[in-house]
């Protein structure tokens, strides 16, 4: 595998030369300002706060579009622009600037984040209409957008880490937004803790990079990776992967994502489907040169991706909670992207393309799920849905488009980008390529099954509603964003993939596509046909099982695979057995040692000082005569000391 | 026998010459002195109801003017001059003395604000000190609203004594300054409005023990005179290096150093000469306690530094072991006793004793860093302690309006009076030497100087003692902020503008000196010239000044 990047692609960055690009920091500053106004303004901003937040997100999006325009006006090799904001840290040789890197990769993310983010902001006006803390919710959403933009626009790992922690914070705050629900509070804590594990990996890898190269800025680091040892690069790559696993809910740090569905649904759509959870993929693609210098790390990335792809799909097949089923699907789809990112330059563009289309259709699916929940008194159990297609036509239609896109119906967005990944996997060659390829094909079949299951349980079959359910279509403020996302789910894939538009745009960063765009090959390759067949099988099996009136309202016992999948493949049990309980034991042991050992010594000293104090204060009799005597004694000591030392 | 062949030039006998006084350079002293004298005249001739306003204005203006004059003189002192002597070389004007005088005047002003504070027309002072406590006469005076405005001239004389104490250039002038400072304070201690017997007992004790210590001081002067044949610091210093008037006279010097040391150590209040401090601090009216704990301590250490650095600057090896013993005793014993104190004023008194021990480590250092460190420490501690006592005046018993000294009553104060408790918390953290407060920088400065002078064991004791003191300071903070309010919860007065200013001054100084000590250490505290800094103690030639240039 030749490195197409280290040689030339990353070599040059140019400084911003005025205009829109020089003020790229406005993209971050606007939502950050919105968050600050909403959080500091307090109740005064209740009435108009959400509109301010939307304005902030939208203007950030507009600025991103303008920046893209200016970027496209440049020659492809000049599309890496550094925007220096200010010097952040300077301690001796440790010198970090807060600089932004505007290049095709970062702009792709910026557009996705601000675009989908703005839509979800608008949707939330309707979804959170009856929540008394709506202003705080919008403040957090703005904060998230700002932090996510810091993450993707950073031109060095330190600033990236700043954004990384920022989105972690926003995610924590939003998962636990309904903190009065114990499950939400616990889920927020769980997400935070598991993410800390990944964060440590990222942090250590940044430290390693700094000690090795003396800088953490992307370009200088990538230019000198060839000079560093392969072992070191493997270590850095694996640590980066650990960070990516935490943020993107990949095995073995996947357990938090399903619980994170306790957060409000717009949060699930924006953070836990479309943007934040894809940060790990961004990290791997951005750090491409490091992984290319460490084939072992790349292999591990593909294995993690493949394993998560299957695990997420299996979990998605068994969950009755609509959001958790979709969360399993998210895991699985990010598994696709991770796998592609691990393939190296031939997979990067495919990974990013799938990431973008997934951002649209998965956000649309979540918003649809939110619309259903909104209509069904926040019921999440799909066994309590059924036959909703007639009462919620808009939701049904938009959800349906997203559904067709994700399962890979030809010429819809998901098909274009998933085919890209399948093709890249087989193209990588060798036995590994074959295995990975067939995993992605199998995944396509599983995707078709679990998504059809969701679709049929929700919108088809008999009505299994709770007695007090009175479903209705959502207001326009919610359905319009869903419609826009549905249009993206249908058409965006073709726009991005035909003639490799996105791949060519990304080429200065991730390398040019390996071969010409060939639609006929895409349609007729045996792997593509196999995926299509498996998809049809999956849909058909789901139709037989779930699109009828025999679906029980309570879940049947199920075989051991179903039980395991419901238990999220025992991920929580493993975490609890391996880490939580030993950790609690250690805590208890430490506390015991502190109580009896350390405190014993400390309180012993304190007790003896106190006893000495009680005795010494007896000298303070209150009688002037005894004070005078003490003074006389003291004078004698002073005289004797002076004489004794000098004359003896 | 001691030869009484007094040298011809130093005889302070009657001269026919009129004394040639530089009134301009003496003006900070003279202004305060004049205010005291005018205050006495005001007492004699002005109607009683108008005295309060005239006296407070007079005292504050005088102290303020004297402070400004001090600053002007700092600016007027030629840059290459180590200092000047005035009035037959009895008074010295150099940068350290001007610094000490400035600090004393600022602290006196802060204390004056507390002294002038009145609640419903009641000051902290008794209406008629001569009335027997609990008698009909006393009640009559209370009902008539009598006031002791003599307090102000007395304070003026005390402040004058403090100023002169740090500026004296010979032992006799210093002794006079000591008495001028002490006598008004003895009186002031007995003037508390509430718990008058307690206050009078404190005054009497202070007077008896102070007189006792003055006797030691005077006896020491006599011994040193016998050794050096002079009382001027420069002459004593010269004698220390040349060997004195007579062969084998060294015991005279040693006993003299020890006795003068006893007098000094009594004034700063180190173990075992500290017994008066808790009783007097507790019994005295709290504004006077604030003045004593800040101004008197600064003056006493200013004088002590001058005596030990200048007069005994050539005999460091002779007095250092003695001060080692006293410093260790002070830091250990006072810190341990403070642990079981239950009254806030007594606790602050013991705290003052421990701090005297810490500053003593800078005296032991006997180098330029020790001098600057002690100066910083004194200024920092002075403002913090004035602020702390100002807060004590605000917390009263609900039934009789006396100050609520019992610490159990302070529980939960952080909830009922958060600002007051937070201010006191800050002062306590500064006493404990926590970073970002002035106390940390001060401790660091004196300990650093002591280590540089080879007194590392002393510093180890100091740090351990700090740990013990931190315990009882933090315990009060915990009590205020994390304990349930006591049943006999005190009534917290709303600070008036006077007390509020003093507390604010304390908070501001504590934070400013803690967060930005650099400018103060560089510009405000006088620095010896770099090339002579190491040699200040050993090679002091221009002995009229604390700094050789």
Curated annotation (Swiss-Prot), chain B:
A molecular function GO annotation: NADH dehydrogenase (ubiquinone) activity
> Where in or outside the cell?
Cell membrane
Bilayer topology term? Multi-pass membrane protein
**What keywords is this UniProt entry annotated with?**
Cell membrane, Membrane, NAD, Quinone, Translocase, Transmembrane, Transmembrane helix, Transport
**Cellular-component GO terms for this entry:** plasma membrane
Q: What Pfam families does UniProt report for this protein, alphabetically? A: Proton_antipo_M (PF00361)
**Regions crossing the membrane:** 26-46, 57-77, 96-116, 148-168, 171-191, 206-226, 253-273, 297-317, 321-341, 347-367, 375-395, 421-441, 466-486, 496-516
Subcellular location, principal:
membrane
Recorded catalytic reaction(s): these are: a quinone + NADH + 5 H(+)(in) = a quinol + NAD(+) + 4 H(+)(out)
The EC number on file is 7.1.1.-
A GO biological process of this protein is:
ATP synthesis coupled electron transport
Q: Which NCBIfam families match?
A: NDH_I_N, PRK05777.1-4
Supply the HAMAP family for this chain: NDH1_NuoN_1
Self-association and partners: NDH-1 is composed of 14 different subunits. Subunits NuoA, H, J, K, L, M, N constitute the membrane sector of the complex.
Q: Which family does it belong to?
A: Belongs to the complex I subunit 2 family.
UniProt xrefs under PANTHER family: NADH DEHYDROGENASE
Main function: NDH-1 shuttles electrons from NADH, via FMN and iron-sulfur (Fe-S) centers, to quinones in the respiratory chain. The immediate electron acceptor for the enzyme in this species is believed to be a menaquinone. Couples the redox reaction to proton translocation (for every two electrons transferred, four hydrogen ions are translocated across the cytoplasmic membrane), and thus conserves the redox energy in a proton gradient.
Full protein name: NADH-quinone oxidoreductase subunit N
